[in-house]
Regions:
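C-terminal and inter-domain tail/linker signature
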Residues: 1-139
């Protein structure tokens, strides 16, 4: 069931921080393309990317807002997910020194799934909006 798979991946990896689930859900040589020109290959690099986001926002909670897919078990599936997340900028990481500001972000992720594994991921979210929320005027 595609819906259950997608919800389980997001909940287990992003919300429960169970990074060992990456190896279960993703092909070992998964190809990733993301915001700000990020491109990498492999589950180790994917794990590093996820941990880098969570290092900046350790209380990040992600939810799926919309989910669409097409395909079949034989040929694989193409999945599109619109998600939202809320977290507090409490940790050092890609977004500088902690500001303790709450940040809302949303993004779109597309997956190509073959043989019950994610083989390609495209994820886009507005990193400028994150920086504006972190560095914006203090009221």
């Amino acid at each position: 069931n595609v819906r259950e798979f997608v919800h389980a991946v997001y909940d287990t990896i992003w919300n429960r921080r169970n990074f060992s689930a990456i190896n279960k859900a993703y092909s070992s040589n998964v190809e990733f393309e993301g915001s700000t020109g990020r491109k990498f290959k492999g589950t180790l690099q994917l794990r590093k990317f996820i941990i880098s986001i969570l290092a900046s926002f350790p209380d990040l909670a992600l939810s799926i807002e919309d989910l669409y897919w097409m395909g079949n078990t034989k040929d694989g599936f193409l999945v599109s997910v619109r998600w939202g997340a809320v977290g507090t900028h409490k940790g050092n990481g890609s977004y500088g020194q902690p500001t303790n500001r709450e940040v809302y972000l949303w993004g779109i992720t597309q997956w190509q799934i073959k043989d019950n594994k994610i083989v390609k991921e495209w994820t886009g979210f507005n990193e400028l909006a994150i920086l504006m929320q972190i560095l914006g005027d203090k009221k």
